Design a protein with these regions (language model features):
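ABC nucleotide-binding domain signature
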Residues: 1-8, 122, 197
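ABC-type ATPase nucleotide-binding domains, specifically the catalytic core motifs of the NBD
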Residues: 22-40, 50, 150
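Conserved ABC ATPase "signature" region
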Residues: 39-59, 168-169
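Short catalytic/signature loops enriched in Gly
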Residues: 55-58, 149-239
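Conserved ABC ATPase signature
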Residues: 63-68, 72
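A short, proline-enriched helix->beta-strand linker immediately N-terminal to the Walker B motif
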Residues: 83-87
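P-loop NTP-binding/switch modules centered on Walker-like glycine-rich loops
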Residues: 90-94, 98-179
């Protein structure tokens, strides 16, 4: 009950043949149902639906998933994730299937709930805007490995790894006109035949001679900012 998860597409995670209330009740029965009557479990499910901003909670309790909008279905999934008061909520692209307006509402909801239940959220996303808005600490991955991590300010204002630098250069900036957005050259390595050197080397425009060696170890740029790149090994040797 310590870890809970919110998935990307609620329509594929909710069972289409069971009512919302039945599915919410089952979560509570399996994980937090000891000593609770059916009435108590129903009341808790309705309470959770209200907590995530569903006004007609008793009506939604009786509905099937197909009767709800995408945003409402995702709110139901969030309610089910909160059923056991988890310490960590893993949110895997929870707003990808939603339009921009509903996405903003769901992000606000998650932020408020995090503080309300004193929980932490591990947010998995490709959306840099969502990261900038939601994250306190950011871990950047490339081809399955962590290449840089730091506070949101460090990652966005002082990117260190060439891949992260490329990401920041490729995003549009308000008030700045460009003929063409930057695009990182090359392709991601084949996961079946990964190289034994830095996975980004073949796409990197900042390679140094050392990059031909083994996969680089992590280097600390600050107490919170760390990067796996040979370009910063001089700093590692100084430390």
């Amino acid at each position: 009950n310590v870890v809970s998860m919110i998935f990307q597409e609620p329509m594929t995670d909710l069972n289409p043949v069971f009512r919302i209330g039945d599915q919410g009740n089952e979560v509570i029965e399996r994980h937090d149902g000891a000593g609770k009557s059916k009435e108590d479990i129903k009341a808790r499910t309705i309470e959770l639906l209200e907590m995530v901003g569903i006004a007609n909670s008793e009506g939604v309790y009786k509905m099937f998933p197909h009767e709800l909008s995408g945003g409402m279905r995702q709110r139901v999934m969030i309610a089910m994730a909160l059923a056991c008061n988890p310490r960590i909520i893993i949110a895997d692209e929870p707003t990808t299937a939603l339009d921009v307006t509903i996405q903003a509402q769901v992000l606000d909801l998650l932020r408020n709930l995090k503080d309300k239940i004193n929980s932490s959220i591990m947010f998995i996303t490709h959306d840099l805007g969502v990261i900038a808005e939601m994250a306190d600490y950011v871990v950047v991955m490339y081809a399955g490995r962590i290449i840089e991590k730091g506070t949101a300010e460090e990652i966005f204002a002082h990117p260190a790894h060439p891949y992260n630098i490329g990401l920041m250069a490729s995003k549009p900036v308000v008030g700045k006109q460009v003929d063409k957005l930057y695009s990182i050259p090359g392709k991601v390595p084949n996961p079946i035949n990964m190289p034994n050197y830095c996975y980004f080397k073949d796409r990197c425009e900042m390679c140094v001679e050392k990059c031909d060696g083994a996969y680089p170890c992590e280097v600390s740029l600050s107490p919170t900012h760390k990067v796996s790149c040979y370009r910063y090994y001089d700093k590692k040797e100084e430390n």
